[in-house]
């Protein structure tokens, strides 16, 4: 299997670690190949590794892939070939990896190749992305997509793809301490009776934070008291959000925690919150939803991409119009005024099997064995 793993940052590194563990628990022998060099600083200026966290159980990965060195790709392909694999699994999420992955796959063209598609196309599109994606995914035989939208995108570049659509599994591994809401709020110095919303993860333009801040303004105008925590690394200048908070006069309602959150600190933010909000403008699927479900936290998402596939409106959370501060504000008020928490949590518990890693692995292996 090829993909990022700990100590690389981000949800896909967590995902690769957990998929490896699930495949091994299913009785498969798995060798992980990951990056010794992932992105140049020109593309990713901040530190790419999180050395503070302990990871989630895979400590035998081979850090051998240099994404910009063609001679390295030949060497890596030879190393994989010597293992005589029955199946090669690659994590796919961005065309930056196209030259590297295409070359390795072409050198291993006689092997069975499966791509796990986190996004068939990148969130932030650019002129050559479709060509690079078609070029690389054309090397694959099998595909896992995690939303119906991504399946449609896949078929637009690979008409004969053998694929399955199965949802992103739940991230339950952050619940290390079983931290109570009371303890989490004590650590974060949040009043125990405060209403608390959470926006978590890398802050990007497509994630729609500006509409959530506008919703906070509407709630203030309606004298509905609630506190929003924005926790994560800003991939762009945060000043526009700071200015928006200032203009809306909601500084007393918004707490910003800037920076990448180490794995060991994720728990307290989710444990302290009532509702996790993802006001995205575009999406295929989201690991943040599955972190929230791992903590049995309801979510508020927008009706974009694959988010409605995993959130059942009125049962495990809310699905609202994108780019609409009004519908976000209305859903937040409904959650608290009508005390939806208990009913939503009960439904989240019932859907655990649907989002389990075992279900994911069973779906993947059934596809490969049937073909």
Q: Which residues make up each language-model segment?
A:
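Short hydrophobic beta-strand element within catalytic cores of glycosyltransferases
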Residues: 298-301, 311
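Acidic donor-binding loop of glycosyltransferase active sites
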Residues: 268-286, 297
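Glycosyltransferase donor-sugar binding loop
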Residues: 36-39, 200, 227-240, 259
């Amino acid at each position: 299997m090829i993909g990022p793993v700990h100590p690389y940052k981000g949800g896909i590194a967590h995902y690769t670690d957990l998929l490896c563990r699930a495949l091994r628990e299913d009785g498969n022998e798995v060798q992980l190949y990951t990056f010794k060099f992932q992105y140049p600083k020109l593309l990713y200026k901040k530190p790419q590794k999180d050395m503070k966290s302990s990871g989630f159980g895979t400590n035998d990965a081979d850090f051998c892939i240099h994404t910009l060195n063609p001679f390295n790709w030949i060497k890596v392909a030879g190393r994989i070939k010597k293992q005589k694999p029955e199946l090669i699994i690659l994590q796919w999420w961005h065309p930056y990896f196209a030259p590297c992955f295409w070359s390795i796959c072409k050198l291993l063209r006689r092997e069975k190749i499966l791509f796990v598609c986190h996004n068939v196309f990148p969130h932030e599109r650019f002129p050559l992305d479709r060509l690079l994606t078609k070029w690389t995914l054309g090397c694959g035989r099998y595909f896992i997509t995690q939303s119906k939208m991504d399946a449609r995108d896949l078929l637009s570049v690979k008409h004969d793809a053998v694929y399955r659509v199965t949802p992103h599994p739940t991230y339950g591994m952050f619940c290390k301490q079983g931290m109570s809401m009371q303890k989490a709020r004590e650590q974060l110095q949040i009043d125990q009776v405060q209403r608390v919303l959470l926006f978590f993860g890398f802050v990007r333009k497509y994630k729609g934070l500006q509409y959530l801040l506008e919703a906070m303004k509407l709630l203030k105008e309606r004298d509905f008291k609630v506190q929003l925590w924005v926790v994560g690394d800003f991939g762009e200048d945060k000043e526009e959000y700071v200015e928006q908070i200032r203009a809306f006069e909601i500084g007393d309602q918004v707490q910003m925690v800037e920076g990448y959150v180490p794995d060991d600190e994720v728990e307290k933010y989710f444990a302290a919150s009532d509702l996790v909000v993802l006001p995205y403008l575009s999406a295929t699927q989201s690991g943040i939803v599955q972190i929230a479900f791992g903590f049995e936290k309801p979510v508020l998402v927008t009706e974009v991409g694959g988010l409605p596939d995993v959130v059942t409106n009125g049962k495990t959370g809310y699905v609202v119009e994108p780019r609409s501060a009004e519908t976000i504000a209305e859903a937040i008020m409904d959650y608290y005024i009508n005390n939806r928490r208990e009913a939503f949590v009960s439904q989240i518990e019932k859907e655990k099997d649907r989002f389990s890693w075992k279900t994911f692995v069973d779906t993947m292996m059934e596809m490969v064995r049937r073909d």
